[in-house]
């Protein structure tokens, strides 16, 4: 798409927004319902696209993408009417007689830039929240998942006039052109490197941003944990989508006493969940492209592999891999892995683990497996991270009742459900002052009696 075409889309959306057409709640609900119906209609095409881009099975596509999108749509259709209402707040006595309230208002023209790892979910979920809040939206799906991007464009074109919601497909040139435009809000999901670029571009227009980034999400396993169940849930969360999940456990950090047994249980679970030859499992996906395939393979130290390690370059597949005797200085610990490679590191005390985790960049997620409630409380209170689980992995993002977002280097802002509505809304603080009474004490000339009254009101 050309620079001129992109500018025209943004200008038309701004003009459309200023007509007030997106403000009525009924219109927002109609848009969400239409989108839901269209997604249900195109589910087979969505599944096919996700299979071609990432090798996802239909089951995984529904569980991790389409189903979550439909759930968010249903939730926002139910709750948008209440979220969109003005919220009356207490008026101080000094402002008698008046009514004070907070009025949720859309920002205007929103840009949503989404990644390739969950290309449908991470494009449509923020769109849902932005529409519910009353905005117009420009979507920029990832060029790395072209089949899903084309299906998204088909759905959006059928559902919406481009002056309301539009899709811009393309690569780096389109990204740069979009970021040079003046949007009223930018929502970005992707790497920390690109997130910094987005924030720098947004600062030119003082545009607010939500950044959903990544990081090395630790999975702490305390010695009281149920190791069989721990292994089962770690294997699920780590190797889902071949490890290409922003909240996947990046590495295991376990008590030294239980490491060997934990690794044995993980090896068992890999065989149980993926079979003895995972690369022949039709439900096991693939790495997105050759660049990332090569990058992940280069992180694997064959001398430290205790499970997996094999790959199929032609199919861009890497078997579920576990590495033992890893140190924080190893290559695999210098960047977010974003693939099916699980390093195992050990600590001698929980305090040591907390200190180490806090010495690193704040992760998007943190997981703690333990039977000790005090240990769970200590870790979740003392460590900085976006969100996480106690005795499970990744499921904290699969609910509309809690916001999902990063912290520090892993991002800023959150979305899903009410948090998503808040993200895409500006709350105007308004005082409606009555005209039937006008107390004189704020006006000059000031008097002693007014000062006494003022001091009673304001203290």
Question: Which residue ranges define each predicted feature?
Answer:
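Residue-level signal for inorganic ion chemistry
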Residues: 28, 73, 134, 165, ...
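Conserved C-terminal structural/oligomerization subdomain of aldehyde/semialdehyde dehydrogenase
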Residues: 220, 271, 317-459
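Rossmann-like NAD(P) dinucleotide-binding subdomain of oxidoreductase/dehydrogenase enzymes
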Residues: 93-229
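N-terminal Rossmann-like NAD(P)+-binding subdomain of aldehyde/semialdehyde dehydrogenases
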Residues: 1-101
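Structural signal for hydrophobic packing residues in well-ordered secondary-structure cores
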Residues: 17, 21, 36-39, 43, ...
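Short, well-ordered beta-strand elements within core beta-sheets of diverse protein domains
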Residues: 15-21, 112, 219-221, 251-256, ...
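Residues at or immediately preceding the N-termini of alpha-helices
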Residues: 3-6, 25, 43, 227, ...
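ALDH superfamily catalytic-core signature
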Residues: 160, 193-327, 390, 452, ...
């Amino acid at each position: 798409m050309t620079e001129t075409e992109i500018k025209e889309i943004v200008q038309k959306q701004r003009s459309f927004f200023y007509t007030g057409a997106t403000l009525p709640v009924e219109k927002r609900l109609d848009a969400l319902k239409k989108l839901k119906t269209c997604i249900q209609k195109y589910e087979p095409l969505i599944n096919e696209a996700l299979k071609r881009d990432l090798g996802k099975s239909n089951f995984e596509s529904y569980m991790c993408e389409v189903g979550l999108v439909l759930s968010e749509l249903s939730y926002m259709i139910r709750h948008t009417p209440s979220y969109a209402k003005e919220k009356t707040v207490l008026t101080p006595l000094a402002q008698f007689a008046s009514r004070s309230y907070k009025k949720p208002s859309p920002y205007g023209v929103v840009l949503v830039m989404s990644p390739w790892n969950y290309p449908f979910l991470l494009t449509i979920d923020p769109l849902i929240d932005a529409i519910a809040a009353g905005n117009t939206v420009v979507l920029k799906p990832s060029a790395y998942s072209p089949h899903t991007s084309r299906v998204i464009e088909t759905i959006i074109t059928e559902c919406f006039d481009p002056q309301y919601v539009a899709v811009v497909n393309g690569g780096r040139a389109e990204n740069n052109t979009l970021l040079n435009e003046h949007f009223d809000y930018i929502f970005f999901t992707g790497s920390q490197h690109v997130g910094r670029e987005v924030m720098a571009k947004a600062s030119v227009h003082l545009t607010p941003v939500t950044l959903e980034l990544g990081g090395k999400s630790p999975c702490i396993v305390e010695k009281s944990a149920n190791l069989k169940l721990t292994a089962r849930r770690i294997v699920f969360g780590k190797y889902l989508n071949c490890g290409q999940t922003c909240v996947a456990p990046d590495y295991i950090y376990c008590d030294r006493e239980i490491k060997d047994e934990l690794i044995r249980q993980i090896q068992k679970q890999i065989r149980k969940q993926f079979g003895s030859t995972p690369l022949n499992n039709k439900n096991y996906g693939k790495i997105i492209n050759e660049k990332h395939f090569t990058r992940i393979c280069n992180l694997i130290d064959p001398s430290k592999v205790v499970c997996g390690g094999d790959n199929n370059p032609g199919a861009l597949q890497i078997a579920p891999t576990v590495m033992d005797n890893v140190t924080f200085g190893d290559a695999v610990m210098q960047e977010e892995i974003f693939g099916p490679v699980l390093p195992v590191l050990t600590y001698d005390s929980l305090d040591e683990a907390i200190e180490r985790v806090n010495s690193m960049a704040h992760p998007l997620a943190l997981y703690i497996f333990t039977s000790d409630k005090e240990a769970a409380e200590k870790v979740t209170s003392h460590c900085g991270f976006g969100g996480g689980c106690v005795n499970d992995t990744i499921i904290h993002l699969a609910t509309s009742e809690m916001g999902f977002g990063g912290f520090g280097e892993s991002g800023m802002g959150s979305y899903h459900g009410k948090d998503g509505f808040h993200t895409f809304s500006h709350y105007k603080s308004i005082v409606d002052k009555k005209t039937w009474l006008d107390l004189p004490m704020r006006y000059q000339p000031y008097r002693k009696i007014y000062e006494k009254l003022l001091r009673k009101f304001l203290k």
